[in-house]
Regions:
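His-Asp-centered metal-binding catalytic motifs of divalent-metal-dependent phosphohydrolases/nucleases
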Residues: 10-35, 50, 54, 72-79, ...
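An active-site-proximal "capping" alpha-helix that borders the catalytic cofactor pocket
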Residues: 1, 44-61
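Divalent metal-dependent phosphate-bond-processing catalytic cores, especially two-metal-ion Mg2+/Mn2+ enzymes
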Residues: 1-10, 19, 63, 78-158
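Hydrophobic alpha-helical segments
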Residues: 13-14, 44-51, 89, 118
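Short histidine-centered catalytic/ligand-binding loop motif
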Residues: 36-43
């Protein structure tokens, strides 16, 4: 997804895009949603943990320190952005949820949690990507309608 948004993304940004959710692959070290009352606190802890795990992995692979430092900085910020590179990573991650992950998320988490996640995810999109997400449809019309409802609710919050 990152390279669709910026075909010239540098190496650190590409590494961050590939590794931003690395903590989810380790059952023993991953951050669990159930341990947090606040979703944003959970996401911040997930981002910090992912950066920590990625740093260790990159060191073992011999990645140059400056590239590893930037990749880990970006992973730490991938949920919130804050500068052009981390904003781009956040956008790539966000649009990927809607284009790729939402149907599986719906199967795993159910309607209410998917609605909540869609509202949250839509709210963090840049204006450019909000226009793209508004055009997304799914084979399952239930999901298309859920997304439309989530967008309406997210717009009411703004």
């Amino acid at each position: 997804m990152l390279l669709r948004l910026d075909p010239k993304a540098d190496q650190a940004l590409q590494i961050a895009a590939l590794g931003h959710d690395i903590d989810r692959a380790d059952e023993l070290r991953k951050v669990r949603r159930a341990d947090y009352d606040d979703y944003d606190e959970f996401k911040a802890a997930h981002a910090r943990n992912g950066a920590k795990i990625l740093r260790s992995t990159l060191a073992k692979c011999g990645v140059a320190g400056s590239i590893a430092d930037e990749a880990c900085r970006l992973v730490t910020l991938h949920e919130v952005g804050g500068d052009p590179h981390s904003d781009l990573l956040r956008d790539a991650d966000s649009i990927s949820f809607f284009e790729v992950n939402m149907p599986l998320y719906y199967q795993r988490e159910g309607r209410d949690e998917t609605m909540r996640r869609c509202i949250w995810g839509y709210g963090r999109l840049s204006g450019r990507l909000k226009k793209i997400v508004k055009k997304i449809t799914y084979e399952d019309e239930t999901l298309t309608q859920l997304l439309k409802n989530a967008i309406q609710q997210a717009c009411l919050k703004d």
